[in-house]
């Protein structure tokens, strides 16, 4: 039977590999196979719930970038929260780039926001930058609507990191939050809750967003220092 790695190489697109390697400066190009995401998603759907997939999910660490992406796609499909969390927590330390991190969106989180919160608190305090980035993205994805609490943006603001992709996710969170809850989020930009870099990047992202109305964009531009 063809191994998963062999299957991934059978889908290799050399042109896409070269292009994608340029988007992933922190990843050794030799670890990038060059599989387009639609093909990887189709493969994940076909592989899911097979004995081969179950074995693959226990085989960490992986060698290739696409193997980690496939791992994320398989985990995401799990509908039971309790079943998902142990293998997810084993996988989070393997996140080593923004793309795999941002791909990982478990479907069962939307129905388990109360159960997820203690994990988010733990991940926000982790010393691994992509675990922290993942936690902030989950707060952005699931807790800006009906499940919002004023405590959540405070938790994101409290994250202290010099890692570029953590700070970018903080800015993305606050720019998105402005579209949902402008009056509640604006004080984070008028005060000193955010680092100057995150503050300026938040304003930039918000001004560029199609979800922010013109009058709010004008107010945000006036806050630039």
Which residues does each PLM region occupy?
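Alpha-helical scaffold domains
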Residues: 1-225
């Amino acid at each position: 039977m063809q191994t998963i790695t062999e299957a991934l190489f059978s889908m290799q697109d050399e042109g896409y590999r070269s292009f994608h390697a340029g988007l992933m400066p922190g990843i050794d190009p030799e670890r990038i196979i060059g599989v387009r995401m639609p093909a990887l998603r189709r493969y994940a759907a076909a592989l899911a719930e097979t004995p081969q997939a179950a074995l693959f999910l226990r085989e960490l660490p992986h060698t290739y970038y696409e193997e980690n992406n496939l791992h994320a796609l398989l985990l995401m499909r799990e509908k039971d929260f309790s079943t998902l969390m142990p293998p997810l927590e084993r996988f989070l330390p393997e996140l080593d780039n923004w793309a795999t991190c941002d791909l990982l969106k478990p479907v069962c989180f939307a129905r388990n926001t109360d159960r997820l919160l203690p994990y988010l608190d733990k991940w926000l305090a982790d010393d691994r930058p992509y675990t922290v980035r993942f936690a902030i993205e989950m707060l952005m994805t699931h807790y800006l609507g009906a499940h919002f609490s004023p405590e959540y943006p405070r938790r994101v603001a409290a994250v202290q990191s010099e890692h570029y992709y953590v700070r970018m996710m903080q800015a993305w969170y606050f720019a998105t939050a402005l579209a949902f809850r402008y009056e509640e989020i604006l004080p984070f930009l008028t005060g000193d809750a955010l680092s100057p870099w995150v503050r300026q990047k938040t304003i930039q992202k918000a001004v560029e967003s199609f979800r922010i109305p013109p009058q709010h964009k004008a107010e945000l531009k006036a806050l630039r220092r």
